[in-house]
Amino acid sequence: MNRFIIADASKCIGCRTCEVACVVSHQENQDCASLTPETFLPRIHVIKGVNISTATVCRQCEDAPCANVCPNGAISRDKGFVHVMQERCIGCKTCVVACPYGAMEVVVRPVIRNSGAGLNVRADKAEANKCDLCNHREDGPACMAACPTHALICVDRNKLEQLSAEKRRRTALMF
């Protein structure tokens, strides 16, 4: 079973610290000072309602719809998470439509391309953007480490069984 992150809405205060930690974690220089509206592209999103806030993030589906519909095979399961190979992504947005959680998005990043005439030109490349569980970090997902209320938890098979057992116990004790 793939691990995934879920948010406890009863603990989330909507501060968006998880979003900032995510973006900084995925930057080369990992510096908050270099963030701009163009580079602020989190892979986790805080949704605020009238009385509740919570974060939405990729569920790392076992039979990932995003991977199943990708025409270039740019999305695959790798080391326990669903991974996007950006060099294969064509930005077609099929994965965005297929994701039942709204956790996949296509973002535009500036790239330098060779024009064929020996000139390098600046262009934009659309690519899929989703949670990768911060696989580049030894300490695990940056969003979880940064959350001041510990509203984010990483769920694996054991944690899922524990959560289910707690819910069954609460349900049984209600009657």
Swiss-Prot record:
> Which residues are involved in binding [4Fe-4S] cluster 2?
C22, C131, C134, C143
Keyword set, alphabetical order: 4Fe-4S, Electron transport, Iron, Iron-sulfur, Metal-binding, Repeat, Transport
Domain 4Fe-4S ferredoxin-type, first and last residues per copy: 2-32, 48-79, 80-109, 124-157
Q: Where does [4Fe-4S] cluster 4 bind?
A: C70, C89, C92, C95
Q: What is the required cofactor set for this protein? A: [4Fe-4S] cluster
Cofactor binding summary note: Binds 4 [4Fe-4S] clusters.
What PANTHER family does the database record attribute to this sequence? ELECTRON TRANSPORT PROTEIN HYDN-RELATED, OXIDOREDUCTASE
Q: What is this protein called?
A: Electron transport protein HydN
In its UniProt entry, the species of origin is given as: Escherichia coli (strain K12)
